[in-house]
Amino acid sequence: YSESEEIYLKIVDYIFEQLDNDLAYTKKVYKYMLKGDIINGTQICKLLLEQDIIDIDEEEEQRFLNGSITAYAFMMNRIQNLDITPAQLALDPHSASMVITDVNTGDVLALVSYPGYDNNKMANGVDAEYFNSLLNDQSTPMINYATRQMTAPGSTFKMVSATAGLMEGIITPRSTLFCNGLFDKITPPASCLGRHGSLNVTEAINHSCNMFFYEVGYELGTEGESYSSELGLEKIRNYADLYGLTETTGIEIEESAPTVSTEDAVRSAIGQGTNNFSTVGLARYVTTIANNGTCYNLTLVDKITDRSGIVLTDNHASVRNTINMDSSYWDAIQQGMRKVIESKSYYNDLGVKVAGKTGTAEENKNRGNHALFVCYAPYEQPEIAVATRIAYGYTSTYAARMTKEVLKYYFDLAEEDEVITGTASQIT
């Protein structure tokens, strides 16, 4: 048998071996050292310089070293100039995704996930050291956030509920419901962010009135005098299915399967409950709205060629289903989305009319809300649809502003260097 001291030493060796590979523990050590004034911010900044983690001009480096720039200002400059990226910080928010589709064909024009990695180091033999660094990266760059990350859709889901309400005869384009800020037909009551008074479905989408859609969710589950959440959920699922939100989108790479809510029809009608969708799933959904009801199985593949470039197969997205809905219903929903954008002053100078819907979704009370935005443009004759998500991005305004920059570039309203400036647009 081993002696107790020998066992103790082996346990200690094992613990130290594990701690050497525990990035979370290492971060806690640094945090303890900073809070205990064992090291200070200036020393941390000097480490970044000495280890060549950042590259800055000599003038700023000298100003920092001689004390003309504080450590705080130095770090803010690094973040502002993207010398240190959100992915490197791995603080919220550090990831985002965007999907752009051709609304008339179902082709995926762009599918972007941040952070990413260098494909060149993963081809023709994997760089083992680089691959290991990706596996241990706290920003998880190997996850395709556009296809694999699932979050609640927030208020971007309200067009599904609007469709359900209209097609089930609960509401008409002109009928109104009254919002007093509290829906008390269920226990516990559900609240609205405002007291909107009487509004129709177009105004409810514009103002993102929870109360309006709570009532729709409740009525979907009501037969006679009896309310059944299960019945309401079944109907919500049926209309979510019309927009392709019950299954994967058809793209030729792996994606996570969506979830349509299975609890609380009233709250599910505003995008809460257990609703969970990918960014590419939301892109297919808004594509279907933009083209008045054609739901495509999306595709990433344009054509297949042989080695010499001869086309073997021309590929086209297939139509999954169509939504046969009265044109006045489409008008009511789309006008609501247009009014959403008209209320955003930062879209006034874009030069192309856009229809869209913002959404925020809480997943963790200790972290920021997910920021979501879906849209299509031009409003009168749609060409593209866009879905954007910034995980733990706090406010949907950030997702909407980021999308605006992409729209400017797509519609030739700005040059690439005007959109990609190499600096952060805002630090808060």
Labelled PLM ranges:
Residues 1-155, 160-392, 428:
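Beta-lactam-recognizing serine transpeptidase/beta-lactamase-like catalytic domain environment
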Residues 391-410:
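Amphipathic oligomerization regions
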Residues 311-312, 316-318, 404-428:
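Short, gly/Ser/Thr-rich active-site loops of penicillin-recognizing serine hydrolases
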